[in-house]
Regions:
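Feature captures outer-membrane beta-barrel proteins of Gram-negative bacteria and organelles
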Residues: 50, 74-86, 108-124, 130-132, ...
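Flexible, glycine-rich linker and terminal segments associated
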Residues: 25-35, 41-42, 49, 190, ...
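Gram-negative bacterial Sec-dependent N-terminal signal peptides
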Residues: 1-23, 583
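Transmembrane beta-strand segments that form the barrel wall of outer-membrane beta-barrel proteins
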Residues: 56-66, 87-97, 127-138, 151, ...
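Gram-negative outer-membrane beta-barrel proteins
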Residues: 65-69, 97-101, 121-123, 138-140, ...
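Short, aliphatic-rich beta-strand segments
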Residues: 57-61, 302-310
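Transmembrane beta-barrel domains of Gram-negative outer membranes and organellar outer membranes
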Residues: 24-142, 154-158, 206-208, 228-238, ...
């Protein structure tokens, strides 16, 4: 005990004396929040009250964790996210090795979730923070379950942060099972020294981190190494390596986006000056040259109407809308208006999807130009998402449709993976493939959709004789369908009917219906489908059952929070009946969601699962210009992990809560992945404006 006290005193004394010297030279340094060797932001084994920044994604690899009765030579892979302001969420895989069979060897392999919330009551006190958290929440086998409360204070006299807290932990070693505390000191912007008492022993570590702006895209990286521990780890290396990257940039919300880019400001001045002399033909040519299809210009009530379709800006239809609005406002002046008999430079831009109207914007050129160049605000911008077919019927078209996209095709390439994560068979088992999806536009609202799967690689457990052999990808046509989209008159309900082959072997039909409120904050959906297997019996002689779904959906959207909640209930693909609840947070065009589902088959008990999913674009912001063939990537690649909850054991299970997910669903092709409605576009005015500036910057480069 005396040795521990002496060691702790030396650590504390070193930290303090070092701080007095270095702070005089670098008074502006702030103590950076960094990951710990547990599943939270903190020191070595204890947390502080700091949380990951909102919209920041992090990954860290750690060696040496408190497990059972000692600090073990095990490793963890932790993925973290600043989910909302003040809340960090972490998913962690803990393992002793990466490929052994846990049923044979008996080694630990654990998948868990953790959360820490910084209480908002002390926002006016920048130096003092208070947080509560839970590590290893839920699940059936909890090796690291810990609940805690922690406060920290950052001093003015030196770059020092002190933390104290209290925890209740199931870790037999006693880490965080009682009072704990620690000190972090950052003498320079690239080094941090920490000392802590973890409720059981004293520890100290050195952390090296990259200074701000050293790495591109605001990436930060750090390396931590434990230099002392009372847990008797002299023969063990306890360390972690981490990086983090912000998922949100100035592009979507900043008023001053590209304000200091003088070459871009000059280009904007030149473009906006064109509206004085431009004609309708030059406007149409400008839109055509940027890759917009189905371009047509007309009049209604003395106002110019421009209809067009975006197939180039696939991350978000708001980007295509912004580029089109910028081009129209830069070319539609008095001269162009007089070309077709318009009374003023007021205009209506109607955005189409496969020749079907999805959103309309009303503005005028002078006002919108001021909004884009930042010289003045523009209140004359109105978004409309209801009764659009009726509005188009009133237009007196003055030009023929230019750059028709009929019979044009898109080939969308996307990686595919079926996997087992942190199972008893391995940390990560996989079957990798590449899909090529041919989507050909026919008449209005109609398309052909064919997807081929090409296997690339698989782990040994997906090979013949392995546990997952039945789930390995095969070289085949996996989907071949015809889609037809239409709207029901008067009630403004959107529908898409799909006929053909799905999941390689099933032939049948699917119907999707959706109703959006004017604001877009609420939408109701209904899915019905019926499919029959091509073969009456499987390879083992058992009958292949028919598949049918009947699912009702409700989604509540809050664009100001970039958040959605969805409830789905009914009969799922495999015949199980129940409900699924999903919360989704958007970080620009990356969707992070967590789902809880509870379903049952007729002759079984209810089963509960939690799924974490990340959908992200794997295609450039500005794709190749649409032609007869357009090649691009997947705008919403889905990577997800599922685990069982609410049961004594976390055995592997597949199929429950399974849905008929299609890349070309109505929601993705026509309604911007559910980011839709008047309120959504109003909240994203700044992004719509900045899209045109980004487009000009792309042309300059």
């Amino acid at each position: 005990m005396i040795n521990k006290i002496i060691a702790a005193t030396l650590v504390s004394g070193t930290l303090f004396s070092f701080s007095q010297c270095a702070y005089a030279e670098t008074p502006a340094i702030l103590v950076k929040e960094l990951p710990s060797n547990q599943s939270f932001t903190g020191l070595t084994f204890i947390p502080n009250a700091q949380v990951q920044n909102y919209g920041s994604f992090g990954f860290d690899f750690a060696h040496g964790l408190p497990l059972r009765n000692n600090v073990s030579d095990i490793e963890s892979l932790t993925f973290s996210l600043g989910l909302i302001e003040g809340l960090e969420a972490q998913g962690r895989i803990v393992t002793e090795d990466y490929s052994s069979n846990g049923f044979v060897v008996g080694s630990i392999r654990d998948l868990s979730a953790s959360f820490k919330y910084q209480l908002p009551f002390f926002q006016d006190f920048n130096k003092f923070k208070l947080a509560v958290g839970v590590q290893d929440l839920g699940g059936e086998l909890n090796y690291f379950n810990t609940n805690y409360i922690v406060a920290d204070y950052s001093f003015d006299f030196a770059p020092i942060r002190m933390s104290v807290g209290y925890g209740q932990s199931d870790i037999p070693l006693g880490v965080m099972d009682g009072p704990f505390g620690g000190v972090e000191y950052q003498p320079f912007n690239f080094i941090q020294l920490v000392g802590e008492y973890d409720s059981e022993e004293f520890n100290s570590s050195v952390k090296i981190l990259t200074p701000k702006e050293l790495l591109p895209y605001d990436i930060t990286a750090s390396l931590s190494y434990q230099v002392y521990s009372g847990h008797g780890t002299d023969t063990k290396n306890v360390w972690n390596a981490a990086f983090s990257i912000p998922l949100i940039s100035d592009y979507t919300r900043s008023v001053s986006f590209s304000q200091n880019d003088m070459s871009l400001r000059d280009k904007l001045f030149v473009e906006q000056k064109k509206f004085q002399d431009a004609s309708i033909s030059t406007l149409v040519s400008a839109l055509k040259n940027e890759g917009f299809v189905n371009v047509q210009v007309g009049l209604v009530n003395g106002r110019v109407v421009v209809a067009l379709e975006n197939r180039r800006y696939n991350h978000n239809q708001a980007d295509g809308l912004g580029v089109a609005l910028g081009i129209v406002s830069s070319h539609l002046g008095q001269n162009a208006a007089q070309d077709i008999g318009a009374a003023s430079d007021q205009f209506e831009l109607v955005m189409l999807a496969n020749q079907k109207p999805v959103v309309s914007v009303l503005s005028d050129s002078n006002c919108y130009q001021s909004f884009v160049n930042g010289s003045a605000s523009c209140d004359d911008i109105q978004f409309i998402t209801r009764d659009l077919p009726e509005r188009l019927d009133m237009v007196d078209w003055k030009t023929e449709r230019v750059n028709s996209g009929t019979l044009d095709s898109q080939i969308v390439f996307s990686p595919m993976v079926r996997h087992g994560v942190a199972t008893e068979y391995g940390v990560y088992d996989y079957s990798f493939a590449m899909s090529s999806n041919l989507y050909t536009y026919l008449w209005s609202g109609a398309a052909i959709d064919v997807r081929h799967i090409l296997p690339l690689a698989e782990s040994d457990d997906f090979e013949e004789g392995g546990y997952f052999e039945d789930s390995v990808y095969e070289n085949e046509i996996e989907r071949a369908m015809v889609h037809q989209f239409f709207r029901l008159p008067y009630v403004d309900i959107a529908n898409q009917v799909s006929l053909g082959l799905v999941k390689s072997d099933y032939i049948g039909a699917r119907s999707e219906s959706a109703w959006f409120s004017q604001s877009g904050n609420h939408w109701l959906g209904l899915e019905m489908s019926y499919f029959q297997h091509q073969d009456e019996k499987d390879k083992n002689g058992y009958a292949n059952p028919d598949r049918q779904t009947f699912l009702t959906r409700y989604t509540f959207s809050m664009p100001e929070w970039d958040w959605q909640f969805n409830a789905t209930a009914g009969e799922f693909w495999k015949g199980d009946v129940g409900a699924k609840f999903t919360t989704s947070h958007w970080f620009e065009d990356i969707e992070v969601s967590a789902s809880y589902q509870v379903t049952k088959f007729n002759d079984t008990d209810e089963e509960q699962f939690v799924t974490v999913s990340v959908k992200l674009p794997l295609t450039p912001w500005r794709d190749m210009s649409p032609r007869v063939i357009q090649v691009r990537g997947n705008e919403a690649y889905d990577f997800n992990v599922t685990t069982r909850v609410g049961n004594d054991y976390n055995y592997l299970a597949a199929g429950q809560g399974d849905e008929l997910v299609m890349d070309n669903s109505m929601l993705r092709r026509y309604f911007n992945r559910g980011r839709y409605g008047q309120e959504y576009f109003e909240q994203n005015r700044q992004r719509i404006r900045n899209a045109y500036l980004r487009y000009l910057g792309t042309r300059l480069n």
